[in-house]
Structures are given as structure tokens and as C-alpha cells.
């Protein structure tokens, strides 16, 4: 289901939860207590900028695909390519009371386009798995824009389509090889992160690949109780999360360390502190919360 909600004074578009339980979005975000106020305000500006790019190009159907994950990509591309920044203060339907800082670069438009492609292929995957009315409507709603974007970004679109199809086939085979499953999502994000085919493309691919693997593993671990209850696919089915905790933590550390090593090779000119906060702290927000909950259960 897609919905918009207010969290305190901030707008949060709740990530669409796939019928099979794996939205695989929402993990790549800041850890607010460890971020300087000026950096937090900057991050919010980029988040709002992406939201406005989605709305201006695609309307509400674009705006509801907004994720924190793509905000990281906008920051990364804007920093490495030293993109021109357009900063404004605007009102919006979510924040009608006052104007909000909105920071936009060319990378926001790219991320908005990729968000639409990802949304379309997630609906296609849902339709394959569940044959639900919601998925069918989603495919119809996003198909037209997707066709145009496939022409504009053939490499990225092909990687997303092939990655989702490989993932679907492995799930149909009841594959329990987490690394093989995560590889599918990693390959998708690798091509998404490589905006341009230049001398930096391989470093972007490496960052996206390992971050994608981290996201898949984290998502499977978080969704295990719900997937078990609803008898949905999950590579960790049949194992208690408390027993899995050390193994999953080691897997996640391996992937995020590799993502961080690739990220540090990129010549980031600005926003480095924000991105390091995300990569080395924020991505662990949900895992740390689950870990605390499991520890409380044992007491």
C-alpha cells in the first residue's frame, strides 16, 4: 500500500510494501542524533528537492514513490560531479503552514526517473507473484512512463528488469542462498548508481552493488516474522531471528564495509559528512532497533 503520513513536523512517504513482504527501501537514511544541525537541514533540503522533482515531472504518482534511499544517491552524484545547486523555499501540500528549504540538482531529476522505473518493475514483480488487483493497477499506472524511461535509460532499465526477473526465478526455486539473492538486487543498484559511463562509473557501481546487497539482507532479516506468519518467501525461513542475529550482523558488516571502501574512492566535494553518517550509522538504524528488541525479549 502506498500512503503518505506525517511524522512530527516531517513528511514521510511510507515505502510501498510489496505483496511478498520485501519493499527493499527505506534503509539508507541518516542517523539524526549524530548529524550536525546544518547537515540535517541540508539533508532535508535534498529530500524535499527529490520530492519536488517527482511531483513536477510525474505528479502524485511520482511523489508517492519518494524514498530516503534515493536521497543518498542524489547527494552522492551532486557531490562527485559538483552539480549546480538550485535552492528555493517553497510550500507544499504536506507542509502548507510555511515554506520549506528545497535543494535541487540535475541528479534529483535522474533519481526521480529511476524511482519511477523501480516502482513499475516492483509492480510487475508483484503481479507475477500474487496476481493481485493492486499490482495490476500499479502496472497500468506506471507502464506509460516506464516505456519512455526505458528508452532514455536502456542500461539501467535492463539491469532492473533482469535483476527482478532473476530474483523472481530464485524465489520460485525456494533458493536459500542469501548471497545469490542479494546479488540480484546488488547488480540492479550497481547500474542505477552508475549515472554516467565515465572513469568513475566502476566506483559508483561498486558502491551501489554492495549497498544493494546490504539492503536485501537487511530487508529479509527484518521481514522474517511477518513472512513466516503469512507463509511468504524468505531465505531465512525456519530460523529464529535470535539465532540468526550474529550471522546476519556479520553479513551486513561485510557488505557495508565493501560499500564504504568503494565510496571513499569517489572524489566527493561536498556533503561527505552527511553521506558518511548514512553509510556508517544510518543504515544500521533498523538493525539496531531489532537487536534491542531481541535483547529485551531474552531478559
Name every feature range the model reports, one short phrase each:
Residues 16-206, 213, 217-240, 244-253, ...:
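Acidic catalytic motifs of isoprenoid enzymes
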Residues 277-281:
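A glycine-rich phosphate-binding loop feature that marks nucleotide/adenosyl-phosphate handling sites
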Amino acid at each position: 500500500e502506498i500512503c503518505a503520513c506525517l511524522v512530527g513536523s516531517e513528511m514521510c512517504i511510507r515505502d510501498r510494501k510489496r505483496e511478498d513482504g520485501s519493499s527493499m527501501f527505506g534503509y539508507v537514511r541518516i542517523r539524526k542524533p549524530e548529524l550536525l544541525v546544518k547537515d540535517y537541514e541540508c539533508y532535508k533540503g535534498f529530500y524535499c528537492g527529490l520530492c519536488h522533482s517527482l511531483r513536477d515531472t510525474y505528479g502524485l504518482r511520482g511523489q508517492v514513490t519518494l524514498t530516503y534511499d534515493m536521497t543518498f544517491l542524489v547527494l552522492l552524484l551532486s557531490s562527485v560531479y559538483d552539480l549546480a545547486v538550485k535552492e528555493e523555499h517553497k510550500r507544499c501540500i504536506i507542509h502548507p503552514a510555511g515554506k520549506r528549504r528545497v535543494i535541487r540538482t540535475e541528479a534529483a531529476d535522474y533519481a526521480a526517473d529511476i524511482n519511477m522505473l523501480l516502482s513499475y518493475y516492483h509492480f510487475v514483480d508483484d503481479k507475477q507473484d500474487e496476481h493481485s488487483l493492486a499490482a495490476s493497477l500499479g502496472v497500468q499506472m506506471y507502464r506509460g512512463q516506464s516505456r519512455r524511461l526505458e528508452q532514455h535509460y536502456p542500461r539501467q532499465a535492463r539491469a532492473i528488469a533482469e535483476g527482478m526477473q532473476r530474483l523472481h526465478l530464485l524465489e520460485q526455486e525456494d533458493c536459500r542462498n542469501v548471497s545469490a539473492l542479494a546479488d540480484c538486487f546488488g547488480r540492479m543498484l550497481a547500474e542505477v548508481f552508475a549515472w554516467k559511463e565515465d572513469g568513475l562509473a566502476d566506483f559508483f557501481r561498486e558502491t551501489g552493488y554492495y549497498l544493494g546487497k546490504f539492503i536485501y539482507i537487511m530487508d529479509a532479516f527484518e521481514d522474517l516474522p511477518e513472512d513466516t506468519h503469512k507463509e511468504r518467501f524468505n531465505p531465512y525461513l525456519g530460523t529464529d531471528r535470535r539465532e540468526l542475529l550474529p550471522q546476519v550482523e556479520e553479513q551486513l558488516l561485510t557488505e557495508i564495509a565493501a560499500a564504504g571502501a568503494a565510496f571513499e574512492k569517489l572524489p566527493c566535494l561536498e556533503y561527505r559528512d552527511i553521506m558518511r553518517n548514512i553509510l556508517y550509522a544510518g543504515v544500521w538504524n533498523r538493525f539496531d532497533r531489532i537487536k534491542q528488541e531481541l535483547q529485551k525479549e531474552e531478559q
